[in-house]
């Protein structure tokens, strides 16, 4: 423990690691003979996280084991146990296949791209992002709704590979082992089962264009991005070992799955079908490739995505956990934001339950949680920088319902004055 000279030496305490005084930091934790401040604790935690990320348990192939991949996914994504297991095995096998690509030439292992099917806000995008973080490979996201056939206004499918190249700093070797996540894949389904005079340039046409790069081809990628620079030299990227993960909400697919096998009949002798009262996520667990064909995906495209992982609807308990438990949980993010104003932010348990219920009512899943919290905390974040001596803000259920303002707890940090409360 360090001390100042003179009369202050008995009263002022210092961090034994960085030397800051108790007045310069929020918290000072005492040990037997030393002190450590909250900033040094955070720094130590960051170092431990980085080291744990690099010390993943790996199999003999140098690839993280499925259980280890699952464990790290659990740190960031709540629930979705079935999808995590499917993804962990598929990704492990994919990179194990790459590790043995040159060792055995008698049997060629085919690539297994992945299809994620789940309601909005169930964690599809977050799962793909976390996988790339675990494996330390280039990762890019693409929106299927912006893609069109070559020659039409919109993005070419080759632009997806360009984004992957940019994510790998134009290192072609690294890009060829990366992960591509294509979101909103359900939006490029065929518009109709019947052939039309007009071309479906953003539906079936895009599916046809994606086939080759997903299966494996040498794509000619313009480094400056497409059609505006026709004279530029092209980079050659082999997509054979790029893992493609496609995700979509597939609204209406649950009806196709429920109707499968029931048959149809009309007339007085027709059997009345009981409505399927299962939740959407439960119905998705029964999905078959034939259901995706009826939805509007072409057979060749479905065949390029042999691994199907379905995600479930998030209930109130899961949404509450999402608010609090992941490493980058929303409550932790807002608490950190308030810490910058030297204020503790506290949510009562019933308040978090109400936030979760609101997200369920809006049918936005986890994606809607941030919007709800922003609305609740807007006035507080507006007023707080101009208020003095506020030490704590408490959010109760009445605040979430809009019936009252947050509770402000005032106090003087420099004196032994009693705290005061205001609403």
From Swiss-Prot:
Residues 3-56 form the ClpX-type ZB domain. InterPro entries: AAA+_ATPase (IPR003593), ATP-dep_Clp_protease_ClpX (IPR050052), ATPase_AAA_core (IPR003959), Clp_ATPase_C (IPR019489), Clp_protease_ATP-bd_su_ClpX (IPR004487), ClpX_bact (IPR046425), P-loop_NTPase (IPR027417), Znf_CppX_C4 (IPR010603). GO terms for biological process: cell division; proteolysis involved in protein catabolic process. It holds the Pfam family zf-C4_ClpX. ATP-dependent specificity component of the Clp protease. It directs the protease to specific substrates. Can perform chaperone functions in the absence of ClpP. Component of the ClpX-ClpP complex. Forms a hexameric ring that, in the presence of ATP, binds to fourteen ClpP subunits assembled into a disk-like structure with a central cavity, resembling the structure of eukaryotic proteasomes. This is ATP-dependent Clp protease ATP-binding subunit ClpX.
